[in-house]
């Protein structure tokens, strides 16, 4: 009698759990715009969500610790004249976020560590180059201030956000609307999917298609694709019978998928969130109430189903926390921020362990906030892997880094030359922009206090009159 061999994996028992009710973010009017993006972006400091707003597009930015009910007058980030379609935090500065809009522009914003008293309306820079709506944003994983945008004009533009210049424009590769764009780990290649049902690998600096596969999935619904850590590709799509699929591809041989998993029948496009440290891909569909996750390995069958986290409410969007924002003391290997119609709910993925010690096997060194290259170095042909950090002592986000406006680079946040001596907050020079912003905030607070004092005085007088009248 043969014995069934159980596959050995430290991720066989990954469990998902929704955070407690008091850890959710309540009373948020999540955007109802029809667009297949995540509508949510998160980093170790902030949570950003695209919201409903009159008179243009807007998104809300909350400190992670600001859970509970969000005041209806909480300041928004506004400035777009059309709906916001995508947002993405800069991986090298936790206070910088980019937004893309139906109004054809991309805006880059500096988010202060303190809570502003009014809407943030002035971006650091507005990037204008698309002729139709912009629905996709993606920062370069290793080069400072390099941002990619893709629009309804079938064009991909790669910007140097620090100078506002167009580094590259890929305008003759895609014959139809682009559905997704993803960098590989060192930012040397792009993987794109398009309405023409073709999966492409592109060298952006040569404006060349390195490899392509027509109809990787036979269905008519949109595709998505992401690179794996070893350079393979994961794609999500639909079969001819509308079954949702996950496929693994070797770019050196696009004839047949290395592995193919078929799932349920549904209309929701599956958004893949890939973690290179664990080689787990999480699949989240808009309108679904579940998250499926699979482990990708180098031995057959290559794609291994792990589990499904299910809940009652369908998701309107999803945010995925970078590894450096996780709680390693709780063996947390992933954290999602699930958007409901009126709230955002954290979902935590853990690997149960008996020991309280740091689990080295769960937490290899992971990309940190330091860029490996400058924009001009990358453009000249240099490549570099991400600068890694250890999570053993628990990641602590760096203090707020102010954008210094210079002719060369408006997002120049290069750290001091000597890392051994840190400059205290009292020694750090304030830019003119920061000083003016703080003075405006102080004036607004004074005006508010004065108005409240006048209101209190008026109410006290009314109370005295009422008391006198009853005597």
Swiss-Prot record:
Coiled-coil region list: 426-468
Name listed for the protein in its UniProt record: Coronin-6
Keywords: Coiled coil, Repeat, WD repeat
Species this chain originates from: Mus musculus (Mouse)
UniProt-listed PANTHER family: CORONIN (PTHR10856), CORONIN-6 (PTHR10856:SF23)
Biased composition (Low complexity): 419-429
Lineage of the species this protein comes from: Eukaryota, Metazoa, Chordata, Craniata, Vertebrata
Chain intervals for the UniProt region annotation (Disordered): 410-433
The gene coding this protein: Coro6
WD repeat locations: 79-119, 129-169, 173-212, 216-259, 264-304
One Pfam family of this chain: WD40_4
